[in-house]
Amino acid sequence: MLALNKLTKHFKAVKAVQEVSFSVDKGEIFGLLGANGAGKTTTLRMLATMLTPTGGTASIEGLDLLKDPDKVRSHIGLLFGGDAGLYDRLTARENIIYFARLCGKSGEEAGKRAESLAQAFAFTEYLDFPAKKLSKGTRQKIALARCIVHDPAVMLFDEPMVGLDVTSRKDVEDFMVLLKEQGKTIILSDHNLNITERLCDRIGILHKGELVALGTLNELCETNGCKDLEEVFFKLAGRDSE
């Protein structure tokens, strides 16, 4: 489980995130929406211990984000879209094994995990190809496999499907559903409202660093008198924000 209580981040005079509070349960996919600059990525980076909050608190699996950052990090899988962040000179297998070893897995355990994840993501035939020779879709699958190789309880996804073709996007969506069924806690930040509607149990909308809406799709539509998520989003976040 993951919980935020008035989590805040200021960059000098800029209030990037302002007293954001919400919680995400095990087996839940939580969608985090907002226009560019709304504070989505800053929020995820704080949860991933990549940024230190200015104020407020957060806990992951009962661990305090500020007091136990190293322990918190071991419970998190993180994937940012756009750049898979692979080591181009290493093969797909080596990329996964290397990260697994960094997370404390034995060589044998890391090797088995690489094989099983390659099967799950359907890139077994590319396991021994250098990462630089692989397509964007395959690279993103490998990056996703790498970020869950240590079996984290909490997954943070920031635009994980950006630039992927329809088939690769479907593969990633299906695997996110599988992770949910396994009881993982997932936050998904994505500009694609259709993906958010399909995958997310609840949705939070950020606007200028503040959480302006929180609830299920039906709750958001009923509360705001809207017919769908797109209408809710533009009503609360502003059509000129995108």
Say what each PLM segment does.
Residues I97, R101, E108-Y126:
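Conserved ABC ATPase "signature" region
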Residues P130-L134:
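Conserved ABC ATPase signature
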Residues M155-D158:
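Catalytic Walker B motif of ABC-type/P-loop ATPase nucleotide-binding domains
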Residues T196-R198:
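A short, surface-exposed alpha-helical micro-motif characterized by mixed small hydrophobic
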Residues L214-G215:
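ABC ATPase "signature
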